[in-house]
């Protein structure tokens, strides 16, 4: 927090910049230059989003933590003034509400229904299964022709197979589900197409929950079916929860696998250290540093003030939206004074990043993502020690049109 004189927010500045800001294509790992400028010069400011409204943009790590843990900051997307990502996201929040978009106590009540499978103990017990999936996919890479698209061959299949098994979703339906998910998260999806995809996804999951009512398995959707029968939630609620877990459970992890591998390939000395080390702490800290450095969920955390809140010498009034660019907080020199713009797998406080958000809405699957990344990076580099980029960095198609950063393809060879 800063010691500036307390001021109240009046009308938004006429020169509020457009949001989201564009990345510099020559620096694909970096936050947009405009975001870095706000962090350095105006850490609490306004920006203009798609509907013409001007929510607050909070860039400093300390301010983000303070607000994301403040009960006066609401995640209720139905509140007037909530800064939705797009018109389609606004529609989705109203048509298919999820517990992730609710406040306590309702958020906590629903979250507790799905927490058990994501506890550290449960996830650690899944390591052998995740290792087996990873080895099978790398076997396929080694047996096939080169170059290989790492996204298609490894980065996407690992988290998709894992989350499908956890949810009880048939893996053979993955293409249908992935197409719908893509339509919902692309910034440039034609208005209405995301809505159609969301409806199709919700109907699919609602029907699947219906089948679980009479034929339960050892999976999350079956657990939700029990709650439906008990009258704790509706079948639509269960479908909405499943939809959120399905999307969040694979998209960001798939992007991290591919983009993190690319970042290591661009830092060969650090890659070699990760590959050759027998110390498990090395891969653990490498994953934390990659999460900090890349911050896949670059523009997903939005909130609204439920009451007037003073922070950093500014009053954010009730009903005003707040945008949290996590990539700015994770490059904040106040927390990371030593070259935050560089990858450093030995960074001592890397784990203090906000890549999974913060507060009661922190990512439910954070432990799962960490374990998947640890297994995939270490196994890939150990089994293919000469892994290399097949082409040049400027040929890689980056996901600049999505709310989650990543690459569409990553051709590799060895």
Swiss-Prot record:
The keyword Iron applies. Its EC number is 1.14.-.-. Keywords: Antibiotic biosynthesis, Heme, Iron, Metal-binding, Monooxygenase, Oxidoreductase. It is an enzyme of class 1 (oxidoreductase). Pfam families: p450. The macrolide antibiotics FD-891 and FD-892 induce morphological changes of human promyelocytic leukemia (HL-60) cells and have cytocidal activity against tumor cell lines in vitro. FD-891 produced by Streptomyces sp. MAFF 225003 and MAFF 225006 inhibits growth of rice and alfalfa seedlings and may cause russet scab in potatoes. Belongs to the cytochrome P450 family. Monomer. This is Cytochrome P450 GfsF. It comes from Streptomyces halstedii.
């Amino acid at each position: 927090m800063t010691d500036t004189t307390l001021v109240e927010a009046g009308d938004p500045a006429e020169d509020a910049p457009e949001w989201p800001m564009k990345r510099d294509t020559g620096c694909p790992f970096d936050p947009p230059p405009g975001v870095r400028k706000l962090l350095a010069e105006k850490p609490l400011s306004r920006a203009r989003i798609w509907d013409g409204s001007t929510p607050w943009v909070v860039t400093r790590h300390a301010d983000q933590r303070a607000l994301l843990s403040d009960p006066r900051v609401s995640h209720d997307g139905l509140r007037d003034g909530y800064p939705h990502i797009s018109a389609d996201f606004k529609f989705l929040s109203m048509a298919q509400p999820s517990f992730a978009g609710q406040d306590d106590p309702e958020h906590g009540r629903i979250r507790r229904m799905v927490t058990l499978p994501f506890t550290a103990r449960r996830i650690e017990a899944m390591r052998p299964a995740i290792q087996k999936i990873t080895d099978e996919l790398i076997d396929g890479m080694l047996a096939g022709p080169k170059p290989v698209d790492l996204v298609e061959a490894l980065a996407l299949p690992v988290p998709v197979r894992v989350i499908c098994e956890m949810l009880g979703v048939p893996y053979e339906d993955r293409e249908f589900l992935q197409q719908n998910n893509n339509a919902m998260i692309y910034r440039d999806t034609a208005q209405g197409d995301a809505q159609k995809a969301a409806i199709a996804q919700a109907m699919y999951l609602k029907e699947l929950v219906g089948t679980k009512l009479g034929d339960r398995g050892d999976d999350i959707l079956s657990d939700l079916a029990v709650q439906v029968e008990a009258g704790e939630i509706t079948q639509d609620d269960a479908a909405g929860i499943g939809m959120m877990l399905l999307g969040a459970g694979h998209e960001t992890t798939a992007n991290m696998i591919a983009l993190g591998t690319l970042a290591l390939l661009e830092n060969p000395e650090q890659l070699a250290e990760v590959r050759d080390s027998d110390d498990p702490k090395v891969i653990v800290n490498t994953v934390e540093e990659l999460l900090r450095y890349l911050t896949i969920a670059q523009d997903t955390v939005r909130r609204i003030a439920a009451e007037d809140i003073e922070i950093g010498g500014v009053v954010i009034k009730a009903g005003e939206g707040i945008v949290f660019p996590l990539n700015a907080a994770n490059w904040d020199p106040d927390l990371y004074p030593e070259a935050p713009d560089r990858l450093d797998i030995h960074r001592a406080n890397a784990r203090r990043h906000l890549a999974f958000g913060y507060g009661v809405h922190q990512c439910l699957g954070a432990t799962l993502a960490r374990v998947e990344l640890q297994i995939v990076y270490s196994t890939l580099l150990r089994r293919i020690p000469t892994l290399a980029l097949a082409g040049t960095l400027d040929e890689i198609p980056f996901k600049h049109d999505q709310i989650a950063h990543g690459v569409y393809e990553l051709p590799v060879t060895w």
